[in-house]
């Protein structure tokens, strides 16, 4: 059977369901596919198909994630749903499933619970741009005042983590009613209302191509009579012959001009996000550039050594450490293409971090790295991955 061609006639957006265990994330995911299947925007995927998500390995970490896709009148969506709480933590920290927005599912019968908080905090720390709330299981709550109370509680919780709690759309409904074709006003209609809110409220992500040029340097060559060539895969933006670029990280930032772009040994006039290229740099010596630096549009990114991070520490079974670590732990932090040693400081009240924990921590690197908030990294000991993290806030 021929593979269906992926039609790219609508803007694409990546979203996911987050929230406390048993509040109905997977039922909601199934309900969205069921309701949108009526108009041909999805293939109905039943609860048990989503629930037995296959295991994937991202950066050496095992994560179970279910992927479904669907479309509304406005957009094409890739939607991720994880069976277990630990899978969410790993997914959000490693960025294995990039989220342009999230649907926070809260059971109206229980209100916000510990993992509701933790997922909102993670969404804030890893930079999920926007959330929409589905207040699920409203068929189990008879008292409308109670519903209003839960809604208020959710809004306050969102605001306490710097999300615009007063403005975030909260849709009340029942995923189960939608799946069982009961009470359309809280079933099918609520799902359609939710998708309208997702369409309208979650901003369309900027395509990598439209962002300022950045290429992590993987290798450096000297070509006699022509100069120095750096190679790598363009992460974002585009580069043209004649563009001025900065070399950022590890040493003092320097400026140069791209005098040639080649791909597969052919000369091009430009390279764009996703391309593996070689860039010829004017007047740059072979020893001025090294793997681990980046080539970037001038002024678009700066080098830093100190930042706050959110990290997940692998279990022994995942190939991680067998023992806890403490403040002043000194592993290597692997950013893009290179390892840099750094010192970890744990927050007040955290004595130690056990394998399998996720933790907020401060890091100080021994050499500066070009970074933005949201940049992912691996934590390594002698080339072995023992954790994964994301830059939450740059301090210096």
From Swiss-Prot:
Its EC number is 3.6.5.3. Residues 136-139 are annotated as: G4. Residues 60-64 are annotated as: G2. It holds the Pfam family GTP_EFTU. GO terms for cellular component: cytosol. Residues 19-26 are annotated as: G1. GTP hydrolase that promotes the GTP-dependent binding of aminoacyl-tRNA to the A-site of ribosomes during protein biosynthesis. Belongs to the TRAFAC class translation factor GTPase superfamily. Classic translation factor GTPase family. EF-Tu/EF-1A subfamily. HAMAP family: EF_Tu_B. This is Elongation factor Tu. The lineage of its organism: Bacteria, Pseudomonadati, Pseudomonadota, Alphaproteobacteria, Acetobacterales.
